[in-house]
Every structure is written in structure tokens, then in C-alpha cells.
């Protein structure tokens, strides 16, 4: 059933990041037409129509990287350094996974209330999959592989679990694969997972150069990770699993891959990602990055490399909120560039670029895009010039949310 909604401000979230006044959208499951609200109501007088005063209409957000499995965490993990955090995850992570269904349900609710319609969910145990299927969210679930030594048995078990996930696919849930990180996945195992992604035409995700410790290890087999392998894995004289960052990047040639974090990636490494990986996308999680490494992604460097950036929350293992609105505000405070310019980067990072990263037909208000739309109400109208920044600063909870044309809030 087609209907029309309009608002005093409409963010198209297209390449130009256009802001339109008093515009509207005709939609059913997909967007049919965009235009001046009054003109649309005259053209389609038979359709239900609603206009939202002092409101912003925009695409539903895409949170392209989160870990629902850690939604139970409050203060079980150590912050202030990547090494301290990783050690605490290995020591305490098992307890966090226990009885986490309620916390995951709350996390899904937080996504929806903050205007998120699609998520990229990293999963080791598939605990969240049924809850995602029952929710209105569109989900790309990345089954994640970890293993620092070769094990055919482990690989076969992983392939069987991926088949289980593939069997659960439907219109709004897609299966994908993740190679955890350069310090945690042996090369032959990583190549097998990447080949599985190619064979199944699945997206890939990987954490990449999130810390100085990881960079030192990958490039020189030195630093904190020497003790890490001895202490946690009981392996001495362990060397980096790769011959540098480029060796890791090159495995992902001819794939669609999300590279997550990347704060310690050089311009050369980013350019190599751009040139070697068929469809490469960068994901930044500013709150997590501040808690763990203290370093933000270099946006000038990513721009020079020609790579788009999506903004995501990561999980509650390294965040205090799964609201993407909170994350976008953290993004604004993390980067030193003119605020109006940065606000546009943030908005597109949570919409257009996130949709492209997850290969979804949404993230923009454009004809034939899926009608994933949100409306946020405010007490006053923003000026057109300040609208995106003021929206990001003041938005707290969505007023209404349409996913696939159906109102879910």
C-alpha cells in the first residue's frame, strides 16, 4: 500500500548530501517518487499522507559493524590500552556470553530506537541470529573465524556452522564471513575462509591495524604480542603470521571486504587496499578506538587513498552505548576538521556508505531504493545550512521508523 510522508527537512544522503525543505516521499516497499510534499499530495490525492513539522526525514541508519554477543558487558574489560583490553577479554569474555539473550534483545531495541534499520553483526557463536530474525532489522551476519595455527578439523567445523547460517537466510538476513585479524588467524586458514566467501559470493570483514601493538607484530614480529602468544597460547618463538601488512591485504584480492578500524594503517597500506581489493570499505568505531588505542582514523589519509568511511558502534565490549547517534557524536568530537564538513562525513558514514559496505539497496532517499526511512522530531526547525550538524547534536530517539515500507516504530 503506497503512502506519502514529508517533513520540514529531508536529508537525501546522496553523494552531494543534499538537504531539501518541505519535501516528501511516495513509497511502498520501495521508494516510488521524491518531490515537493504539497505537489505529491496533489498528484496522489488518494494516498494516505502525513507531514512532520519541525522534523527531519532521512534514510534509516546502517550500523555496519557491531558485536551483539558482548551486549552483557558493563565493566568486565579493561580500557586505556589495546593490550590491557585484549587480555581482559580473553580472561573474562566467557562469562559475558552467559545468559546474554536479554541483553542482546535490549541491544536490538537500542538500534531501532536510534534509527538504525540495518546492521553488520559479527558473530562467533550465532547466539544473536534468531533474535535478529525475529526483529525488524535487516542483518548481515558475519560468522567470524579465529585460529592462530592450522587445524583442518576446526576449519571443517567452521564450514558446517556457516552452512547452518546460510540455511537461515531470508529476505532480511544474509550470511557473510569474517577473518578476525592479522594477529589471530593463520594464513592458510584465512585463505580457506576467503575462498569460502568467494565460492558462496559472501561479503567479508576483518579487523585491521587497530593498535600499535598489532602493527609492530605484523611488520616486525616484535612487541607485546611476543608475550601474548607465550602467556595465552603457550607458544614460544612465535612469529607474525604474515610478512607484513601488504601480505595480509593481498589475500583479499577479488573480494568485497570491510576493513574495520585501520587507525595504524599507513597511506601506502590504504592505497594497497584500494588497488588490490575489488570492493573495499573502511569502517571506523571512534568510541571503541578512544577506549583501546586512543587514536582516531586519519580521515585525510583515507580521502587521499580514495576510500569511503562508514561509522559504526562496535560492540559493548568496547563501548558504553550501541546508539549510533551517540557514536556519530563521538565521531564529531574525535576528528579535528571543520564541523559542518565533518557532519556530512558522519551522516553519509551512517547511511550511504554503510549501505554500500553491506551491499544493501538502502541508505539513500532515491527512487527504487528500499523504503527504509526514519523521522526525528524536534522542538524547532533547523536552518538548512546548520541542519545536519544540529540534527547530529540533538537527535536522541526516532519518532517513526519504516523498514521495507512497514512502520516498525
Curated annotation (Swiss-Prot):
Keywords: Hydrolase, Metal-binding, Zinc. GO terms for molecular function: adenosine deaminase activity; metal ion binding. Optimum temperature is about 45 degrees Celsius. It catalyses: adenosine + H2O + H(+) = inosine + NH4(+). Optimum pH is about 7.5. Retains > 70% maximum activity at pH 9.0, but displays only 6% activity at pH 4.5. Its EC number is 3.5.4.4. Zn(2+) binds at residues 65, 67, 207, 314. Binds 1 zinc ion per subunit. Its cofactor is Zn(2+). InterPro entries: Amidohydro-rel, Metal-dep_hydrolase_composite, Metal_Hydrolase, MTA/SAH_deaminase. The keyword Hydrolase applies. The keyword Transport does not apply. Catalyzes the deamination of adenosine into inosine. Is also able to deaminate adenine, but with considerably less efficiency. Is not active toward 6-chloroadenine. Belongs to the metallo-dependent hydrolases superfamily. This is Adenosine deaminase. It comes from Helicobacter pylori (strain ATCC 700392 / 26695) (Campylobacter pylori).
Amino acid at each position: 500500500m503506497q503512502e506519502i510522508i514529508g517533513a520540514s527537512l529531508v536529508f537525501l544522503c546522496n553523494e552531494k548530501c543534499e538537504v531539501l525543505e518541505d519535501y516528501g516521499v511516495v513509497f511502498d516497499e520501495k521508494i516510488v517518487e521524491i518531490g515537493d510534499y504539497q505537489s505529491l499530495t496533489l498528484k496522489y490525492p488518494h494516498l494516505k499522507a502525513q507531514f512532520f513539522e519541525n522534523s527531519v526525514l532521512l534514510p534509516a541508519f546502517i550500523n555496519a559493524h557491531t558485536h551483539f554477543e558482548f551486549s552483557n558487558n558493563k565493566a568486565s574489560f579493561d580500557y586505556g590500552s589495546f593490550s590491557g583490553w585484549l587480555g581482559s577479554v580473553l580472561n573474562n569474555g566467557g562469562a559475558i556470553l552467559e545468559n546474554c539473550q536479554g541483553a542482546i534483545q535490549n541491544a536490538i531495541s537500542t538500534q531501532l530506537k536510534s534509527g538504525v534499520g540495518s546492521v553488520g553483526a559479527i558473530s562467533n557463536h550465532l547466539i544473536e541470529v534468531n533474535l535478529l530474525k525475529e526483529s525488524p532489522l535487516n542483518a548481515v551476519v558475519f560468522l567470524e573465524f579465529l585460529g592462530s595455527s592450522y587445524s583442518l578439523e576446526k576449519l571443517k567445523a567452521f564450514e558446517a556452522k556457516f552452512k547452518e547460517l546460510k540455511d537461515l537466510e531470508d529476505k532480511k538476513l544474509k550470511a557473510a564471513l569474517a577473518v578476525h585479524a592479522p594477529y589471530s588467524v593463520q594464513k592458510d586458514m584465512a585463505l580457506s575462509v576467503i575462498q569460502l566467501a568467494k565460492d558462496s559470493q559472501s561479503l567479508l570483514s576483518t579487523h585491521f591495524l587497530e593498535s600499535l601493538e598489532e602493527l609492530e607484530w605484523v611488520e616486525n614480529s616484535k612487541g607485546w604480542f611476543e608475550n601474548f602468544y607465550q602467556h595465552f597460547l603457550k607458544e614460544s618463538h612465535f612469529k607474525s603470521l604474515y610478512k607484513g601488512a601488504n601480505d595480509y591485504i593481498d589475500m583479499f584480492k577479488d573480494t568485497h571486504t570491510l576493513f574495520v578500524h585501520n587507525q595504524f594503517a599507513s597511506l601506502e597500506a590504504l592505497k594497497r587496499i584500494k588497488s588490490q581489493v575489488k570492493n573495499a570499505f573502511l569502517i571506523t568505531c571512534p568510541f571503541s578506538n578512544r577506549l583501546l588505542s586512543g587514536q582516531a582514523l586519519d580521515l585525510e589519509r583515507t580521502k587521499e587513498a580514495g576510500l569511503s568511511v562508514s561509522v559504526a558502534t562496535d560492540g559493548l565490549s568496547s563501548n558504553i552505548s550501541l546508539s549510533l547517534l551517540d557514536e556519530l557524536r563521538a565521531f564529531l568530537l574525535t576528528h579535528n576538521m571543520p564541523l559542518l564538513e565533518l557532519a556530512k562525513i558522519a551522516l553519509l558514514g551512517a547511511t550511504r556508505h554503510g549501505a554500500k559496505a553491506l551491499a544493501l539497496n538502502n541508505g539513500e532517499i532515491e527512487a527504487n531504493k528500499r523504503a527504509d526511512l526514519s523521522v526525528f522530531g524536534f522542538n524547532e526547525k533547523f536552518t538548512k545550512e546548520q541542519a545536519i550538524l544540529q540534527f547530529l547534536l540533538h537527535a536522541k530517539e526516532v519518532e517513526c521508523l519504516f523498514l521495507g515500507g512497514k512502520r516498525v516504530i
